[in-house]
A protein has these predicted regions:
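A structural signal for short hydrophobic beta-strand segments in well-ordered beta-sheet cores
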Residues: 104-107, 190-191, 271
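Residue-level detector of anion-binding/catalytic polar loops
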Residues: 97
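C-terminal accessory subdomains/tails of enzymes that are appended
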Residues: 4-7, 15-34, 38-65, 71-82, ...
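Core beta-strand elements of the Rossmann-like FAD/NAD(P) dinucleotide-binding domain
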Residues: 124-135
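Short beta-strand segments that buttress and anchor functional surface loops
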Residues: 72-73, 118-123
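Short, hydrophobic/aromatic-rich segments at coil-to-beta transitions
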Residues: 114-119, 175-177
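Glycine-rich beta-alpha-beta "Rossmann" dinucleotide-binding loop(s) and their flanking helix/strand
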Residues: 91, 146-165
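A conserved short coil-to-beta-strand element within the FAD-binding core of flavoproteins
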Residues: 100-116
Length: 479
């Protein structure tokens, strides 16, 4: 997915002249070597050692006494929501069936005791559907233990939910053209250039609350600010933050669920079959999703995997094929609709060659080619596309996962909400009352998340967040 993934240079600041430069350089050289062994041409440049002067030209806002130099290496960034939605649409294009707002509430078994299907609840309508399957693969992340229990399993894989929090600050607030990676006493902290912003994080703390709504706390935000400010020439404050977001990592853990430091738990994935007919995969990370998928399916089909080898490495995601031709066509579209170069880059990065479909919408309704009045980084067509092509059912889907307005603007997208609702309403069949209910629901969520950020710990922050009810609440499991 070359349109979704961008190479990003990072600096690893050095505090010691000799041993640290040699130690870090050797580690990153190994990283480069392993990357070179991957199939295909090399995607990233090799690492470089930088003097203090050269380091300062790349990141002027690094405090003068914070480092004597740096090692520059390359990594990549991706919008996880865009990647996942594009992945789902790609799977559907190959014949898969995908259903959002649908929850597995029970697993079914045959006469032999093997799992042979699942009972699903449509969280929108409340309707139950039973799906039969030759084999069920459980890839439910931090819900792994809950869903394993549906099969009556008590000894399967165990995961620890680890919370990671990031803050978002305006790009002009920090002077730099590259990212930073900083070692902390618990893990690492990244300062990542991202479009018009800097994303700073992450934390790594065990999460023992309900996994549905992880939230940032005052303690999380203070931790990030303290560690970032230790190396920045112009310290950040809470007033600089325009957004935060929190997520949970499903970290594999031996034995039972109880644990202390999530930073010491493995990030690798494991595949197991706790009961016949059920394969469980847990652990891993976003960047290894294709390897995880291959391993899970190979495990599930057993000996047939030899005759049916995985071809995932040969399958590009939607938007990748024809990308270069679309870049050229985009010049014509930009001239026709008055799009600035930044908008064209934004659209190509998010949609790749699928941008043609957005242009088709604009040709049918030229008003869709205009930016949103209170969120001009996005076109009105992107809201339409999020509903018509990407399965958004609610305003929160559009502001959290089809756009990222929830943390890209200070008000979490509230000013743009009426216009977004007006675009979505006819596509989703909302009358005025339903549209207002959607606006009210998202407003309550945004306000609750804002308030939660001022709470000292996870328990109190979650309690504040839960003051806003879900538009489609999860159902109890039948384990």
């Amino acid at each position: 997915a070359p349109h979704l993934v961008k190479p990003v240079p990072f600096l690893y600041p050095l505090e010691h002249r000799l041993w640290e430069r040699a130690y870090v350089g050797a580690g990153i050289a190994l990283y480069d070597t392993l990357a070179s062994l991957a199939p295909g041409r090399r995607a990233m440049p090799l690492h470089r050692h930088l003097s203090r002067r050269r380091m300062s030209t790349k990141f002027p806002d690094l405090a003068h006494d914070a480092a004597i130099g740096a090692v520059q290496y390359w990594d990549a960034s991706v919008d996880d929501a865009r990647l996942v939605s594009t992945l789902v649409r790609t799977a559907v294009s190959y014949g898969a069936h995908a259903a959002s707002r649908t929850q597995v509430v029970a697993l079914t078994k045959g006469a032999t005791g093997a799992v042979n299907g699942a009972v699903l609840t449509d969280l929108e309508s409340g309707e139950e559907i039973t799906v039969r399957a030759r084999h069920v693969i459980n890839a439910t992340g931090v819900w792994t233990e809950d869903t394993e229990a549906l099969a009556g399993d008590t000894g399967g894989l165990r995961v620890l939910a680890s919370k990671g929090v990031h803050i978002v600050v305006p790009r002009e607030r920090i002077k730099g053209t590259v990212g930073l990676i900083l070692q902390t006493e618990k893990s690492v902290l990244f300062v990542i250039p991202w479009s018009r912003y800097w994303v700073v994080g992450t934390t790594d703390t065990p999460w023992t609350q309900d996994p549905t709504h992880p939230v940032a706390t005052a303690q999380d935000i203070d931790y990030i600010l303290d560690h970032a400010n230790a190396v920045l020439a112009h310290p950040l404050s809470r007033d600089d933050i325009i957004g935060t977001y929190a997520g949970l990592r499903p970290l594999l853990q031996p034995g039972t669920k109880e644990g202390t430091s999530s930073a010491k738990v493995s990030r690798e994935h494991t595949v197991a079959s706790p009961v016949p007919g059920l394969t469980v995969i847990a652990g891993g990370k976003l960047t290894t999703y294709r390897v995880m998928a291959k391993d899970a399916v190979d495990f599930a089909i057993g000996q047939r995997a030899t005759a049916l080898p995985s071809i995932t490495h040969q399958i590009p995601l939607l938007g990748a094929v024809g990308l270069q031709a679309t870049r050229r066509l985009a010049r014509t579209w930009a001239a026709k609709y008055g799009w600035k170069p930044q908008m064209v880059d934004h659209l190509l990065h998010r949609y790749g060659s699928s941008l043609r479909q957005l242009v088709d919408l604009c040709e049918q309704d030229p008003s869709l080619a205009r930016p949103l009045e209170h969120a001009p980084a996005y076109l009105r067509a992107e809201i339409h596309f999020g509903v018509s092509h990407e399965g958004a059912l609610h305003l929160e889907d559009l502001l959290l996962h089809r756009t990222r307005l929830v943390y890209e603007v200070l008000d979490r997208g509230l000013a743009a909400l009426p216009e977004i609702a007006d675009i979505a309403a006819p596509l989703l069949g909302w009358d005025d009352a339903a549209k207002q209910a959607e606006i009210d629901a998202y407003t309550a969520r945004a306000q609750a998340e804002d308030a939660a950020e001022h709470e000292p710990d996870d328990a109190t922050a979650e309690a504040v967040r839960l003051r806003a009810t879900d538009v489609a609440a999860m159902q109890p499991l039948r384990g």
